[in-house]
Amino acid sequence: MYKKAYGTIETLAPLHVGATAGEESGNLNLIFRDQFTLTGIIPGSSLRGRLRAEMRQNPELGEAEANYWYGDAAGSAHSEVNNESIVKIEHASIVWLPVFSPGQPIVWVTCERLLKRYNRITQKKLTIPDPYTGSSILKPRQSQNKKTLFFNLGFLTVNKMENLSAWFPDGQELPAVVVKDEDISMIHDMALYRQSRVRLKSIPVNEMLKLPLEQ
């Protein structure tokens, strides 16, 4: 009988999980996404591969132990044999997404659907905040009796503020806001870390040796 457990991943640097270098065309951002919110997810296979690599590098455990817990790697001699992994890992989805906002400088954004999923997995049975609810330590701009946040694509109005610390895994409240499900995909794409790629022209070594040297 399997035992269920959940974990929380905190990314300390921009994370890209999607197409590899040979599968992209131009600067398309081909990432794995949740089909409802269109926000990024980490496939369970990627998490299992990372955990397998960590275990394989441990001298006290090694390759055999990694294959026992996570199954044989694709392409290995035993990959075609029914060697099912002991540990089953589902995909990881976003709970809070950091978004740049002048004056904050970071606002953590989520939506109702993502919080409902977090509520279901953790079995905390918390009350889902209403859309456009800000955390109690958020510092929105006051203008015409309205509280607003500024993002790159425009302003967002905060209707009310309350303590959201129960929704953060470590229990520490951060500047945050809950938005509608239909708004999170646009904010998500705005907050993505984009990195352009440049490919230099390849020159054979024999031709490179013929190039004139600058004096």
Locate each region found by the language model.
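Basic, Gly/Ser/Thr-rich N-terminal segments that form RNA-phosphate-binding interfaces in CRISPR RAMP
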Residues: 1-215
